[in-house]
């Protein structure tokens, strides 16, 4: 666990902190809160805000009490703004959403703007308008899913230039493990493949907080092979003074903590990173 005054050079985390499947491994049998999660990981995706909108004030206050100073939340802009309104006329709603997170402003990682699969080149002016008025003290990252942003043509060039001009990161969604053989019929794999877009991986850091969402498989060897190229890239970004965010998933996320630890240990073979804290659940198991 990091001392509260130390800022990580790389933030490692998962898609959530509350998952009962992690009891007995990441968490003790009756644990599973943010405070225990933050003993190990230094960031988390905030998917709850994508589906539920701005969190309540007492909820944010509780998160603020439980998360150490080095921790970073990567909340998602609500789907009501990105998918229902498609960033049109959302200025006051964006302001209200960011204001709801005010107690956590010193612990915000990139707020993720996840755009719909059909949000393409013609709608980039709306994204430009959003980023033009984005508060400079709150990091931001954009995840696109439209196929025309993955062909290295006019649309992708325009997108990347837009993000660079606003010093906003482009989310890199790595689904190679998920869609690689073996293509078995495991229900978790099938469900994850339905939910995640199958897009090429374009590795590009457009700002100072490159954000990688690594979607693993059940096959550890496959995960190792797919993660191997990330090691050199993450090392390079850190040496350039950037602070990468690595968010690790597995198909049903049951094995995500173990995969995240495995990836981090491989990075530690190449960089003098801070040690990852022991899993509270494993620590308690050893006591017994």
Residue ranges with predicted function:
Residues 1-288:
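Residues lining hydrophobic/aromatic ligand-binding pockets adjacent to catalytic sites
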């Amino acid at each position: 666990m990091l001392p509260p005054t130390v800022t990580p050079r790389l933030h490692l985390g998962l898609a959530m902190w509350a998952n009962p499947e992690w009891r007995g491994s990441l968490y003790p049998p009756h644990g599973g809160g943010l405070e225990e999660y933050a003993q190990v990981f230094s960031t988390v995706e905030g998917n709850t805000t994508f589906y539920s909108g701005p969190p309540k004030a007492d909820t944010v206050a509780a998160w603020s009490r439980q998360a150490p100073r080095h921790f970073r939340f990567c909340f998602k802009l609500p789907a009501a703004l990105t998918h229902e309104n498609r960033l049109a006329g959302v200025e006051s709603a964006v302001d209200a959403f960011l204001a709801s997170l005010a107690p956590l402003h010193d612990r915000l990682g990139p707020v993720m703007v996840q755009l719909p699969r059909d949000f393409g080149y013609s709608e980039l002016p709306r994204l430009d308008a959003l980023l033009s008025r984005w508060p400079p003290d709150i990091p931001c990252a954009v995840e696109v899913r439209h196929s025309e942003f993955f062909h290295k043509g006019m649309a992708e060039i325009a997108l990347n230039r837009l993000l660079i001009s606003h010093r906003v990161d482009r989310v890199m969604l790595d689904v190679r493990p998920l869609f690689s053989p073996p293509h078995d019929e495991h229900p978790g794999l099938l469900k994850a493949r339905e939910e995640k877009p199958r897009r090429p991986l374009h590795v590009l850091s457009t700002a100072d907080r490159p954000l990688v969402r690594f979607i693993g498989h059940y096959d550890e060897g496959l995960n190792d092979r797919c993660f191997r190229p990330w090691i050199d890239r993450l090392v390079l970004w850190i040496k350039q003074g950037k602070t990468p965010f690595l968010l690790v998933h597995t198909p049903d996320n049951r094995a995500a903590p173990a995969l995240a630890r495995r990836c981090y240990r491989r990075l530690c073979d190449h960089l003098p990173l801070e040690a990852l804290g022991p899993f509270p659940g494993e620590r308690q198991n050893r006591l017994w």
